Amino acid sequence: MYQIMRKQIEIFTDGSCLGNPGAGGIGVVLRYKQHEKTLSQGYFKTTNNRMELRAVIEALNLLKEPCAVTLHSDSQYMKNGITQWIFNWKKKNWKASNGKPVKNQDLWMALDNAVQAHTIDWRWVKGHSGHRENELCDQLAKQGAENPTLEDIGYQPD
């Protein structure tokens, strides 16, 4: 039996918000071999955490087939949520440990769905530390936030 080699993809993501809540943006750098693709999107009213999640969802949704992904993000919230917390949230019908509904459930469900086809190695990157791709994602996210064109469907003010 042989194993089909999946494409090795590197993804870098960042989310940004001008005010929290406020206008927000996402920045994505997707790399396959020597090819690099970037994505910048802006949303009218949202939060920083929603942008961190949405950046990863949009990045994974760009992939056309199951891939082996190394995903770099400076968001502990996103990384811990998808690698640790989500299992209990799902068991408890999307309730947090305090018994309240999980914040950003719509995006957590979308992220959970987006990761299923891929093998993902989650890497945390220290933000604003001179990491080239993270800095580029930060710029792309800020550009998006400064020029919002999209509605963050699912955003609910506290």
From Swiss-Prot:
Residues 5-146 form the RNase H type-1 domain. Its cofactor is Mg(2+). It catalyses: Endonucleolytic cleavage to 5'-phosphomonoester. It is an enzyme of class 3 (hydrolase). GO terms for cellular component: cytoplasm. GO terms for biological process: DNA replication, removal of RNA primer. InterPro entries: RNase_H, RNaseH-like_sf, RNaseH_domain, RNaseH_sf, RNaseHI. Pfam families: RNase_H. Mg(2+) 2 binds at D14, D138. Its EC number is 3.1.26.4. It is found in: Cytoplasm. Its main location: cytoplasm. Keywords: Cytoplasm, Endonuclease, Hydrolase, Magnesium, Metal-binding, Nuclease. GO terms for molecular function: magnesium ion binding; nucleic acid binding; RNA-DNA hybrid ribonuclease activity. Binds 1 Mg(2+) ion per subunit. May bind a second metal ion at a regulatory site, or after substrate binding. It comes from the Bacteria. Gene3D superfamilies: Ribonuclease H-like superfamily/Ribonuclease H. The keyword Nuclease applies. Mg(2+) 1 binds at D14, E52, D74. NCBIfam families: PRK00203.1. Endonuclease that specifically degrades the RNA of RNA-DNA hybrids. Belongs to the RNase H family. HAMAP family: RNase_H. Monomer. This is Ribonuclease H. It comes from Mannheimia succiniciproducens (strain KCTC 0769BP / MBEL55E).
